[in-house]
């Protein structure tokens, strides 16, 4: 307790007595508690072995499937997602709750970040690739209730997406490293997907998506961070370490995004980048030349 008082987590109004501070009161909120537990148990443990993972990769960007700090810390050859889905679902549930405590993951930001209703002129079909249970897709449909938008949510592990509310999405099992089965959609939407993977893996995902696009009406919408070139925010830099330790991925600057997209498919290019004023999120609008 003395250490925690010194760090202003608790206060000591008199000898032998301790009291809450604004900081300790945050720990009473379940989502904040889950976030702290995730960072201490998942991220810090993984980061403690990241130097070993980098040494094994000879200090080069890891290939898809190369051991990460997470693999070494948890003694598993499964990636983070496979592990929390199959081996430790309680850890996965905690991770999902923790992500709701982080501002960048606020679902309310996404519909305000891009004029999704404008996609109706190109058919109005949004494919949410790697979209989990469809939370984001449903929020978009609820934000534009009379627009005529439709959403297909793809994920490797399909779950029941039913939830209260009028928005209905179609669920489809799909591995985004395989050929994209939905052709010519107005938008292929990727939220927090690419920062989980190294460049070569991301390029493979983009190639499969580009092959399914219609040159005139399709676009790829990437919702991720875009690191500032001068002095990136501290939170963004910490996310960068998180991605490397857990997944072998990374956050990217605009120059790195441009390089990645051009290296994946020559015909793809970024036409616009929209930055959120509410969080670190951004949307990159990618089209075929």
Swiss-Prot record:
Pathway: Secondary metabolite biosynthesis; Alkaloid biosynthesis; Mycotoxin biosynthesis
Coiled coil, from the record: none
Gene3D superfamilies: Vaccinia Virus protein VP39
Entry superkingdom: Eukaryota
Claim: S-adenosyl-L-methionine is one of the keywords in the record: yes
EC number(s) stated in the UniProt entry for this protein: 2.1.1.-
EC supergroup of this enzyme: transferase
Pfam families, per the entry: Methyltransf_2
GO MF entry, a single one: O-methyltransferase activity
Swiss-Prot/TrEMBL keywords: Methyltransferase, S-adenosyl-L-methionine, Transferase
Positions annotated as active site in the UniProt record: 195
One of the protein's GO biological processes: secondary metabolite biosynthetic process
Listed InterPro entries: COMT-like, O_MeTrfase_dom, SAM-dependent_MTases_sf
Entry similarity comment: Belongs to the class I-like SAM-binding methyltransferase superfamily. Cation-independent O-methyltransferase family.
Its biological purpose: O-methyltransferase; part of the gene cluster that mediates the biosynthesis of the aspoquinolone mycotoxins. The role of asqN within the aspoquinolone pathway has still to be determined. The first step of the pathway is catalyzed by the nonribosomal peptide synthetase asqK that condenses anthranilic acid and O-methyl-L-tyrosine to produce 4'-methoxycyclopeptin. 4'-methoxycyclopeptin is then converted to 4'-methoxydehydrocyclopeptin by the ketoglutarate-dependent dioxygenase asqJ. AsqJ also converts its first product 4'-methoxydehydrocyclopeptin to 4'-methoxycyclopenin.
Record-given protein name: O-methyltransferase asqN
Gene: asqN
């Amino acid at each position: 307790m003395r250490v925690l008082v010194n760090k202003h987590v608790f206060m000591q109004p008199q000898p032998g007595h301790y009291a809450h501070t604004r900081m300790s009161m945050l720990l009473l909120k379940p989502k904040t508690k889950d976030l702290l537990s995730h960072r201490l148990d998942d991220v810090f443990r993984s980061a403690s072995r990241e130097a070993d993972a980098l040494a094994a990769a000879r200090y080069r960007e890891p290939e898809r499937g190369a051991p990460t700090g997470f693999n070494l810390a948890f003694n598993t050859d499964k990636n983070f997602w496979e592990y929390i889905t199959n081996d430790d679902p309680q850890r996965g549930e905690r991770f999902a709750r923790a992500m709701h405590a982080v501002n960048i993951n606020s679902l309310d930001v996404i519909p305000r970040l891009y004029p999704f209703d404008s996609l109706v002129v190109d058919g109005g079909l949004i494919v949410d690739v790697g979209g989990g249970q469809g939370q984001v897709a449903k929020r978009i449909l609820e934000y534009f209730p009379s627009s005529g938008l439709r959403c297909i949510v793809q994920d490797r592990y399909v779950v029941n997406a039913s939830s209260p509310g009028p928005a209905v999405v179609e669920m489809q099992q799909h591995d985004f490293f395989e050929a994209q089965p939905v052709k010519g959609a107005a938008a292929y939407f990727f939220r927090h997907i690419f920062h989980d993977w190294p460049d070569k893996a991301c390029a493979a995902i983009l190639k499969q998506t580009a092959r399914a696009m219609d040159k005139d009406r399709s676009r790829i919408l990437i919702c991720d961070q875009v690191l500032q070139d001068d002095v990136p925010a501290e939170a963004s830099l910490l996310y960068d370490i998180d991605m490397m330790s857990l997944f072998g991925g990374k956050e990217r600057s605009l120059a790195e995004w441009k390089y990645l997209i051009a290296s994946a498919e020559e015909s793809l290019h970024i036409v616009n980048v929209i930055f959120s004023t509410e969080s670190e999120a951004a949307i990159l609008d990618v089209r075929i030349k």
